[in-house]
């Protein structure tokens, strides 16, 4: 199973929702809080192409934010990505 990383910030409801969704489906993940870490935020923006949080990665593959994660989980694409990455 590939490593799942969720990049978050404090007081982010979409971050909480993404983490809860992953937990409810028994996906282990690492959370990286980017609050106050401008260098890390710029790196994640460059890798994901997005300026919002959360940003979810499976290995080096950007899934996107909460809405993209939710859609990918519902369609089965997320399970396939995790299994094949």
Features from the language model and the residues they span:
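Local sequence-structure signature of Cys/Sec-based thiol-disulfide redox active-site neighborhoods
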Residues: 1-28
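Structural micro-motif
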Residues: 48-57, 67
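Residues that form or flank phosphate/diphosphate-binding pockets in enzymes
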Residues: 16, 39, 64
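Conserved beta-strand scaffold positions in the cores of enzyme catalytic domains, especially
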Residues: 29-31, 62
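Thioredoxin-like thiol-disulfide oxidoreductase module
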Residues: 33-51, 77, 83-85
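Non-catalytic, surface beta->alpha helical segment in thiol-disulfide oxidoreductase systems
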Residues: 58-85
């Amino acid at each position: 199973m590939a490593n799942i990383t969720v990049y978050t910030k404090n007081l982010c409801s979409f971050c909480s929702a993404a983490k809860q969704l992953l937990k409810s489906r028994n996906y282990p993940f690492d959370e990286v809080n980017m609050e106050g870490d401008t260098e890390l935020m710029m790196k994640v923006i460059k890798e994901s192409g997005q300026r919002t949080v959360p940003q979810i990665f499976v290995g080096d593959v950007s899934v996107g934010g909460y809405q993209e994660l939710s859609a990918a989980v519902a369609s089965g694409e997320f399970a396939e990505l995790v299994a094949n990455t």
